[in-house]
UniProtKB/Swiss-Prot annotation:
The modification Phosphoserine is found at S557, S609. Residues 455-479 have a biased composition (Low complexity). One of its GO terms (biological process) is cytoplasmic microtubule organization. This is CAP-Gly domain-containing linker protein 4. ANK repeats lie at residues 65-101, 149-180, 186-215. InterPro entries: Ankyrin_rpt, Ankyrin_rpt-contain_sf, CAP-Gly_dom_sf, CAP-Gly_domain. Keywords: ANK repeat, Phosphoprotein, Repeat. GO terms for cellular component: cell cortex; intracellular membrane-bounded organelle; microtubule plus-end; nucleus. PROSITE patterns: ANK_REP_REGION (PS50297), ANK_REPEAT (PS50088), CAP_GLY_1 (PS00845), CAP_GLY_2 (PS50245). SMART domains: ANK (SM00248), CAP_GLY (SM01052). Residues 391-410, 431-479 are annotated as: Disordered. Residues 303-345, 505-547, 644-686 form the CAP-Gly domain. Residues 441-452 have a biased composition (Polar residues).
Length: 705
């Protein structure tokens, strides 16, 4: 029933009747009040309602202020409102409302709002407990659910980690109510909700009140299964990792021994000494190490910690790119300067290589590349996965047919194969990459000048064949890489920035091999130099360095590269291989080669990859609720919860639920709710502010939503 469905009541004698005749005394039937905006004083200097302000108090206590307007005030997620839940709630009750009446926008009752108002840092727990007790004494139904979230009062109290309210609610409930499920959380219980959101106080309280720690949700998970893994958390979330470890252990200890909890238990290496772990990895304290192939430093600590389970490494970085000074949560594990300390799982560190120290870098690319020779491997017995049209039945004939190709035709074969392959080079050995680059011109010269001499050398012939049959070579030699990128190629960096490769080799600023890219727009970091060493030359802010795993080709073939219009070249391209154009003329040999490659690489294709049309791939994919996107302004991942128009601005907007509390709201702006999420996890942005797999969000929404 809504407020419009109510019958007529006698209005005489009630001072509240006048402008709002729907207000009546002591209604026995709960109603849903229509949506209204929060009233604000005309001379108000702030954007929210403050019950402590004199002008706001005048509106609050005015009998003409409607219940809908009072509910609108309760929706404001600010301390000034939430800490005065009892004052605003009593004003609603004074207007003759039923204690179970609902807000038309959120479908929440006063008890639901009270459970939210107990959130630490926003509301006041003591006030919320007193008012919740008052509401329950007046007949508030604790089993009522919001039809938007399907959450009842217990679920809200668990979600916002208010154990004091959990005790009040369960005091008058039935024993089974403690395990009431919620569809928005995979039909898990309040214990699942508290565990997933790392609400340690709520978890402890629910267990004390008899919540079932072995209850399984629709995915077959017990509460211990839904606790976020501390190892997957960013290092700056050390406190959250410690809480996760505590909750996990608390839940596992509460599970009956007869329950199979093998899936819930994490591998525990706490009993293994740090020295033993380091020895097994070939490391020792004081060694130079690399973290995830990026940051370099000195190993200062290895062992168990208070903030997470398992063995952790403490590293003093070379640059102030860390998170701490060697301490986390008031526990000092090692000492270093502020911002130079960082902790990482042992699986993320490796010993730094010292080979780059003897290299002198110059603007010349050749001078920056060391001469490294790999072992000569006979690959004549290996059958190529790609049909290149070369004879491979005999070793001599294979070498002869390979070397008898004209230089131009050999180059064409390599180029077509390289372009057809997916532009991923993350698994390629840097040694083989350099050898391939340096030996290729030599092989060309030798072919044109003295074919007979080369054909007599089995090892050299094998290497020449390997240059044309890289898929066969990669089977025999893991250091050879398919689809190798070359200087001068247009590439995509981190799925977003377009540029041209100007440098490849080792650097002084980090171990391993790096690409130096000249970007097409001034979105870079430098002019081709880092730390006083010039690796290549370009305009300021046009240069950037990236590891091979972050660089990929822009297009599928050199034939289509020249046909791409300038506006398409500025688009962001996703990291998957597009299909070949069916309109291009191909020989039977090329078709066979492509089919063979397609079968061997089918796992690398995206399920939504298709032949590009005039509108590109953007036309086949649209953002929808549940899509995972990147908010570029804060580099935060989020889930799309709303796509459509808003009341505060024209056009299409996206409602995002961020993974961390770096948002602006809980899914509502002003007086309107667009979606529901945790406080400070919600944000509404233009589609152009997000990217989806490297594609700008503005290309993935329908303006007619």
């Amino acid at each position: 029933m809504t407020i419009e469905d109510l019958p007529d009541f006698p209005l005489e004698g009630n001072p509240l009747f006048g402008r709002y005749p729907f207000i009546f005394s002591a209604s026995d039937t709960p109603v849903i009040f229509s949506i209204s905006a929060a009233p604000m004083p005309s001379d108000c200097e702030f954007s929210f309602f403050d019950p402590n302000d004199a002008s706001c108090q005048e509106i609050l206590f005015d009998p003409k202020t409607s219940v809908s307007e009072l509910f609108a005030i309760l929706r404001q997620w600010v301390p000034q409102v939430q800490q005065n839940i009892d004052i605003i709630g009593n004003e609603i009750l004074k207007r003759g409302c039923n204690v179970n009446d609902r807000d038309g926008l959120t479908d929440m009752t006063l008890l639901h709002y009270t459970c939210k108002s107990g959130a630490h840092g926003i509301g006041d727990v003591e006030t919320a407990v007193k008012f919740a007790t008052q509401l329950i004494d007046l007949g508030a139904d604790i089993s009522l659910r919001s039809r938007w979230t399907n959450m009842n009062a217990l679920h809200y109290a668990a979600y916002f980690d208010v154990p004091e309210l959990i005790r009040v609610i369960l005091k008058t409930s039935k024993p089974k109510d403690v395990d009431a499920t919620c569809s928005d959380f995979n039909f898990g219980t309040a214990l699942h909700i508290a565990a997933y959101n790392l609400c340690a106080g709520a978890v402890k309280c629910l267990l004390e009140q008899g919540a079932n720690p072995a209850f399984r949700n629709d995915k077959g998970q017990i509460p211990a299964d839904v606790v976020p893994d501390p190892v997957d958390m960013p290092l700056e979330m050390a406190d959250a990792a410690a809480t996760a470890k505590e909750i996990k252990q608390m839940l596992l200890d509460a599970v009956p021994l007869s329950c199979n909890i093998s899936k819930a238990m994490l591998p525990n290496y706490d009993h293994v000494t740090g020295k033993a772990m380091l020895t097994s990895l070939g490391l020792k304290l004081g060694d130079r190490v690399v973290i995830a192939g990026q940051k370099v430093g000195t190993l200062r600590f290895c062992g168990t910690t208070e903030f997470a389970s398992g063995q952790w490494a403490g590293i003093e970085l070379d640059e102030p790119e860390g998170k701490n000074n060697g301490s986390v949560g008031k526990v000092q594990y090692f000492k270093c300067a502020p911002k130079y300390g960082i902790f990482a799982p042992l699986s993320k560190i490796s010993k730094a290589k010292g080979r780059r120290k003897n290299i002198t870098h110059t603007p010349s690319t050749k001078a920056a590349v060391p001469l490294i020779r790999s072992q000569k491997i006979d690959v004549a017995h290996v059958t190529s996965k790609v049909n290149t049209g070369l004879m491979t039945s005999k070793k001599d004939s294979a070498s002869e047919s390979t070397l008898s190709l004209p230089p131009g035709e050999e180059l064409k074969t390599v180029t077509e194969k390289d372009v057809a392959l997916l532009g991923s080079v993350s698994s390629c050995s840097s040694t083989s990459s350099l050898e391939h680059r340096q030996s290729y011109p030599k092989k060309q010269n030798a072919i044109s000048s003295n074919k007979k001499t080369m054909s007599k050398s089995p090892s050299l012939s094998s290497r020449a064949s390997a240059g044309l049959n890289s898929s066969a070579t990669s089977t025999a030699n893991n250091s050879r890489c398919e689809g190798e990128l070359r200087l001068g190629e247009r590439v995509l960096v981190v799925g977003q920035r377009l540029g041209t490769i100007r440098f490849f080799g080792t650097t002084n600023f980090a171990p391993g091999y790096w690409y130096g890219i000249e970007l097409e727009k001034p979105h870079g970091k430098n002019d081709g130099s880092v730390g006083g060493v010039q690796y290549f030359s370009c305009s300021p802010r046009y240069g950037i360095f990236a590891p091979p795993s972050r660089v990929q080709r822009v297009t599928d073939s050199l034939d289509t590269l020249s046909e791409i219009s300038s506006n398409k070249q500025n688009h962001s391209y996703p990291g998957f291989r597009r299909s070949f154009s069916t309109t291009s003329a191909s020989s039977q040999k090329e078709i066979n080669r492509r089919n063979a490659f397609s079968k061997s690489k089918a796992a690398l294709r995206r399920s939504w990859s298709s032949t590009p049309t005039a509108g590109g791939i953007e036309g086949s994919v649209k953002l929808h609720e549940g899509s995972q996107v990147l908010l570029t302004s804060s580099n935060e991942m989020g889930t799309v919860r709303y796509v459509g128009p808003t009341d505060f601005a024209s056009g299409i907007w996206l409602g995002l639920e961020l993974r961390s509390a770096k948002g602006k709201n809980d899914g509502s702006v002003g007086d309107k709710r667009y979606f529901t999420c945790k406080p400070n996890h919600g944000v509404l942005v233009r589609p152009s502010r997000v990217t989806y797999r490297g594609i700008n969000g503005s290309k993935l929404v329908d303006e007619n939503c």
